[in-house]
């Protein structure tokens, strides 16, 4: 291992620029030494491999073998590195200050580091126990200064290392040889430029290291199995003030008072303790802590709380996305894979479903075939053979002519119409011939019947035309035929009277339809009642229009003077209807003798 460290420090490029096989051999030598150290030492975990195989393997395969070894012993190695950090740094600083370029000093330092590492491995178990005891004994306030002390010690070590570098750079300047390249002048010095760049890099590394010091990469990783300490309200806020208890005059048992105080204290603590880092989704669980307060609610308030929960649940279900089967027509890309297997689909089958072939079906078919062969029952359809191949098909073939028609479309329609009329005329002639044939046959049958039985066959009824003259009813009263009904001798209103029903329970409407009162609807009854009222009101209404006209005439005449109204009898009256007396004296005409 020390040889590998020496080669890496002296000339690391020699290893990197080697062949892959040579590099793998160097890695094999280092990892084999680590495995032997783990076997000989008192490490709790042992390596899974005894040695690393390099022959015939590439770098990736060799790396995975190394990873298996390091993963099995990484815990002890990291613990050893953390313990040796303070030991290796001062020794390294001293060696750099004394002899930086001497390989013997480096080898001695590495050997010392290895020996110290082995001793630390031997005492790893004891150190872990001591650390656990110290961690348990220390409080949270004591842990913070320890972290600060570690930071300050690390910063001091880095500053010392930087000073030693400056000293070594000064010594290098004293023993520096003249410019080998010949590029130095009074304005530019190559050695000074290199020193400045190294100093700038060191300052950058120091600043980055100070930022990385906040994170301790060698501390123990927190395990998930360890229970996290609960954070309560008391850790951040003061305890609530207790109300002074009033002293009652009645003397009570001190034990009962203590029990009551404990119960009150427990209930108050349950109310105060809250999980400050709980999510919003855990709010119902946080409310469960205060279930004791629900006991103080009335039955109506509890019922309202349950109703609100149900309403909230229903609203969430209504707003939530519906299932694909409730969205109507869904294509295959819009539904999950194999979703139809769990659904019961209803659709119309256009064809007869194919029967499922089972062992029972096949056995029954085989038995039926054997039985029919034994019985020679071959009732299959006979195969049809066409003997006359030259026979033409019954359907006439349509031939479309390529010659342009000489007739117009109107002429073609006209020919079709006349052809249909000719066919109808032919059918009428054929019908006349059929009627003549049937008449001749009927005469023949009658003659044959007469010859067979003259006494029992009546004469055939001959069709005769009867002409009736519609004469008035008065002229037919004297000579009325006996076979005619009395309806022809009645007046039309006697036969059919609109609005008058034949029975008491019927009503005849204006259109002549007779309906029973029970068949009338409420609207029909109301309509008939309103019509009857209008009819009665018209009958009882006096002749207002005529009187109004007469009054208008009288009013116009009354405005004039010396108006006399003479009626049909020759009486003279004034406009108001009073008889008008003559004011003249006695005359020869009106003197009584």
From Swiss-Prot:
Task: Name one molecular function that GO assigns to this entry.
Answer: identical protein binding
Q: Does the keyword Disulfide bond apply?
A: no
Q: Which InterPro entries match?
A: Mpp10 (IPR012173)
Record's GO cellular component terms: 90S preribosome; Mpp10 complex; nucleolus; nucleoplasm; nucleus; small-subunit processome; sno(s)RNA-containing ribonucleoprotein complex
Name the domain of life: Eukaryota
Q: What are the protein's UniProt keywords?
A: Acetylation, Nucleus, Phosphoprotein, Ribonucleoprotein, Ribosome biogenesis, rRNA processing
Residue positions, PTM Phosphotyrosine: 181
Q: Which GO terms are recorded in the biological process aspect for this UniProt protein?
A: endonucleolytic cleavage in 5'-ETS of tricistronic rRNA transcript (SSU-rRNA, 5.8S rRNA, LSU-rRNA); endonucleolytic cleavage in ITS1 to separate SSU-rRNA from 5.8S rRNA and LSU-rRNA from tricistronic rRNA transcript (SSU-rRNA, 5.8S rRNA, LSU-rRNA); endonucleolytic cleavage to generate mature 5'-end of SSU-rRNA from (SSU-rRNA, 5.8S rRNA, LSU-rRNA); maturation of SSU-rRNA
Q: Which residues carry this modification: Phosphoserine?
A: 176-177
Q: Does the keyword 4Fe-4S apply?
A: no
Q: Where is the composition biased (Acidic residues)?
A: 128-147, 202-232, 256-265
Q: Positions modified as N-acetylserine? A: 2
The record, for Pfam families, names: Mpp10 (PF04006)
Biased composition, class Basic and acidic residues, residue ranges? 148-177, 186-195, 236-255, 266-276
| Primary location recorded for the protein, binned into one broad class | nucleus
Segments carrying the region annotation (Disordered) are 90-297, 564-593
Subcellular location per the Swiss-Prot or TrEMBL entry = Nucleus, Nucleolus
Subunit details: Component of a heterotrimeric complex containing IMP3, IMP4 and MPP10. Interacts with snoRNA U3. Component of the ribosomal small subunit (SSU) processome composed of at least 40 protein subunits and snoRNA U3. Interacts with the SSU processome subunits EMG1, IMP3, IMP4, KRR1, NOC4/UTP19, NOP1, RPS4A, RPS4B, RPS6A, RPS6B, RPS7A, RPS7B, RPS9A, RPS9B, RPS14A, RPS14B, UTP1-UTP18, UTP20-UTP22 and UTP25.
Task: Name the protein family.
Answer: Belongs to the MPP10 family.
Job of this protein = Involved in nucleolar processing of pre-18S ribosomal RNA. Required for the early cleavages at sites A0, A1 and A2 during 18S ribosomal pre-RNA processing.
Report the PANTHER family cross-referenced here: U3 SMALL NUCLEOLAR RIBONUCLEOPROTEIN PROTEIN MPP10
Name by which UniProt lists this protein: U3 small nucleolar RNA-associated protein MPP10
Q: Which organism is it from?
A: Saccharomyces cerevisiae (strain ATCC 204508 / S288c)
